[in-house]
C-alpha cells in the first residue's frame, strides 16, 4: 500500500507537546517529533508525518507538490502551528511502502532451523514490526 511522508522544520515552539501521535483513523496516521534525538540541533523543530494508507492511495496519481501542500496544512492543523512558522519541508511518496496483509507470525524458519526469514511483512506495516520480527528470531536462535 502507498505511503506519503512529509518532513517539516518549524521555528522552535516551546509550548508544543512533542509526543509522537499515532491515529490510524486520521489522515495523518503517524506524527513524530524528529528534533528530540541525541545530537540533533535545537534551532528548529523538525517533525515527520506519515499519511494514512487511505489518504495516500487517494492521491497516488496527484501532483506531488499538491500532495505536499495538503500534508503541510494537515500537519499545521494537527500541531496547532502557524504555517508561516514552517521553515522547510520535504515530501516523499512510496507506492509499495506498507504491507496490507501481514503474515501473522513473527518469522518463518526452515526444517533444519538454519534459515530464518523475517521482516515487517510478517507482523505489520511499520519498522517496529521488523524489530519485533528480528527480536523473535534472535530469541529462537538463543533458545537452541
Task: Label every model-predicted segment.
Residues 7-59, 66, 70-79:
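Active-site substrate-recognition segment that forms the wall
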Residues 47-48, 105-138:
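Short FAD-binding loop at a beta-strand-to-alpha-helix junction that anchors the flavin cofactor
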Residues 57-58, 97-100, 124-126:
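Short active-site-adjacent structural elements
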Residues 60-63, 128-129:
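Short, solvent-exposed loop/turn segments at secondary-structure boundaries
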Residues 69-113:
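Flavin (FAD/FMN) cofactor-binding core of flavoprotein oxidoreductases
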